[in-house]
């Protein structure tokens, strides 16, 4: 079955509309969103509505949580954007729809398992907030701990940098693998990139198509709410990680094995980023830099 995995929309309606249209043109019926629907961008309400309408599974991102609670660890620009986003979702002129949006955000799980696949926003260790950057392949201790929590394949977002991490301390950017990767016996973590705020030097919107070799009848679904996590303090020194926030999952249940090859395809799509930029410029609470960076994909 073919599924689309999207992440890090960040209130960028122009990018999201292009991605949804491309997914539809591919004949794909199921879309999974890995979080951060909002934050940074000028259209938070519209993006939430599109995700509600189109996505079968949606996970909680750190910016989604930041809108509901006090933002933690955000820089000044990101914090101002989140407070502005919260104001849009509290606007009394759209009270009924905003109540539905808050209810939707409040019910989002932090992780989802489907067959041999684990889906998170950040990492398998801390699904909300931990970053896994390409340069982390040189931090073997960190990577070993992360892969210990991956049964087979993990998909994530959060860094806005797409690519494939292997258990052998390698990272492959999409252009290095001709934008396609076939999964084998080894464990991998795959970053699906960002729809609305790419940061790999390519300003085009990014998402992933997963051809998973499973039929709908073979798939076991499991979304795990925050309350079922247990906190542990097992991170070692020098990992650039706060042990007080580390989270570990219960051992994954046995899942169906794919009956065919599993392929991942990275899709890059141009969109009218200038329209998004001008919207950002027109909102005083949003830093102009949030628009400028869309031109460079940084």
Regions found by a protein language model. Name each.
Residues 1-4, 112-119, 183-188, 260-262:
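Beta-strand-turn-beta hairpins that frame and shape the catalytic cleft
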Residues 10-15, 39-41, 65-68, 125-127, ...:
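Active-site environment of divalent metal-dependent phosphoester hydrolases
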Residues 23-28, 148-150, 209:
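Glycine-rich phosphate-binding loop signature in dinucleotide/nucleotide-binding domains
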Residues 47, 53-117, 126, 130-150:
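Active-site neighborhood of divalent metal-dependent phosphoester bond hydrolases
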Residues 139-154, 159-180, 185-189:
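Anionic-ligand binding region
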């Amino acid at each position: 079955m073919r599924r689309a995995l999207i992440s890090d929309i960040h209130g960028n309606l122009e990018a999201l509309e292009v991605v949804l249209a491309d997914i539809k043109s591919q004949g794909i019926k199921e879309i999974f969103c890995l979080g951060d629907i909002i934050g940074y961008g000028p259209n938070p309400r519209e993006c939430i509505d599109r995700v509600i309408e189109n996505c079968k599974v949606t996970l909680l991102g750190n910016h989604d949580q930041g809108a509901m609670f006090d933002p933690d660890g955000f820089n000044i620009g990101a914090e101002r954007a989140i407070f502005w986003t919260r104001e849009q979702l509290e606007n009394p002129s759209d009270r009924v729809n905003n109540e539905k949006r808050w209810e939707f955000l409040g019910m989002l799980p932090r992780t989802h398992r489907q067959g041999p696949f684990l889906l998170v926003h950040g990492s398998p260790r801390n699904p909300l907030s931990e970053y896994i950057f390409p340069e982390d392949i040189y931090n073997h201790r960190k990577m070993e701990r992360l892969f210990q929590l991956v049964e087979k394949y993990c998909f994530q977002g959060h860094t806005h940098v797409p690519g494939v991490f292997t258990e052998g301390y390698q990272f492959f950017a999409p252009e290095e693998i001709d934008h396609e990767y076939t999964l084998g016996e080894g464990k991998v973590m795959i970053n699906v990139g960002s729809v609305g705020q790419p940061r790999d030097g390519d300003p085009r919107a990014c998402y992933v198509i997963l051809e998973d070799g499973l039929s709908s009848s073979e798939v076991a679904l499991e979304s795990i709410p925050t309350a079922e996590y247990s906190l542990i303090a097992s991170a070692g020194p020098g990992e650039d990680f706060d042990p007080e926030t580390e989270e570990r999952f219960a051992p994954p249940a046995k899942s169906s094995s794919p009956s065919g090859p599993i392929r991942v395809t990275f899709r890059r799509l141009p969109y009218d980023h200038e329209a998004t930029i001008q919207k950002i410029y027109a909102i005083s609470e949003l830093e102009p830099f949030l628009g400028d960076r869309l031109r460079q994909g940084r």
